[in-house]
């Protein structure tokens, strides 16, 4: 069974299934996995920090508050925060004519994701971020492996992390 995660959303599962998200541009997709209990989760965050944007609306649309929700729901399925491993995708620079640091949302999303993972003691074990193209990712909850598909310079690139 495949669960599709939209922008500003997340999903968790235990032992089986695929959790996917499509069209990661400047957004980031963060997968977390507890190998021992085979609990996985995926967050598709739109913006870096809730406080910076007034904290309005859905907390899952922000990296910092969305990650917190994801971890809490994974713990309900038996995951241990000490055993979580993270993989990070997305954070592309989608607008080539933008050079203002404040408008480089993709770069900021990646920076905040790394900071928040480190703050929580979660090891980042794989990453495919930046660039100019969108990505689609599929987390296999039975193994923790993430299949990524992206288009770069007109070529489709697939990789497993």
From Swiss-Prot:
GO biological process, one term: chemotaxis
Catalytic activity: L-glutaminyl-[protein] + H2O = L-glutamyl-[protein] + NH4(+)
Enzyme Commission designation: 3.5.1.44
Entry keyword set: Chemotaxis, Hydrolase
UniProt-listed Gene3D superfamilies: 3.30.1330.200
Enzyme class: hydrolase
Keyword Transmembrane belongs to the record: no
CDD domains assigned to the protein according to its UniProt record, in alphabetical order: CheD (cd16352)
Gene Ontology MF, one: protein-glutamine glutaminase activity
Hydrolase in keyword set: yes
Pfam families in alphabetical order: CheD (PF03975)
InterPro entries: CheD-like_sf, Chemorcpt_Glu_NH3ase_CheD, Cytotoxic_necrot_fac-like_cat
Family assignment from sequence similarity: Belongs to the CheD family.
Function of the molecule: Probably deamidates glutamine residues to glutamate on methyl-accepting chemotaxis receptors (MCPs), playing an important role in chemotaxis.
Protein name from the UniProt record: Probable chemoreceptor glutamine deamidase CheD
Organism lineage string: Archaea, Methanobacteriati, Methanobacteriota, Thermococci, Thermococcales
């Amino acid at each position: 069974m495949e669960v599709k995660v939209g922008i500003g959303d997340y999903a968790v599962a235990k032992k089986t299934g695929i959790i996917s998200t499509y069209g990661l541009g400047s957004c980031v997709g963060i997968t977390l996995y507890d190998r021992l209990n085979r609990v996985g989760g995926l967050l598709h965050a739109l913006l870096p920090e809730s406080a910076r944007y007034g904290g309005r609306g859905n907390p899952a649309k922000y990296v910092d508050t969305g990650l917190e929700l994801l971890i809490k729901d994974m713990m309900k399925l038996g995951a241990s925060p000490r055993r979580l491993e993270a993989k990070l995708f997305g954070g592309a620079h989608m607008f080539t004519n933008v050079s203002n640091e404040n408008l480089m949302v993709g770069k900021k999303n990646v920076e905040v994701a790394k900071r928040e993972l480190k703050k929580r003691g979660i090891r980042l074990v794989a990453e495919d971020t930046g660039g100019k193209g969108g990505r689609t990712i599929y987390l296999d909850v039975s193994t923790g492996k993430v299949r990524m598909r992206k288009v770069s310079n007109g070529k489709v690139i697939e990789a497993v992390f």
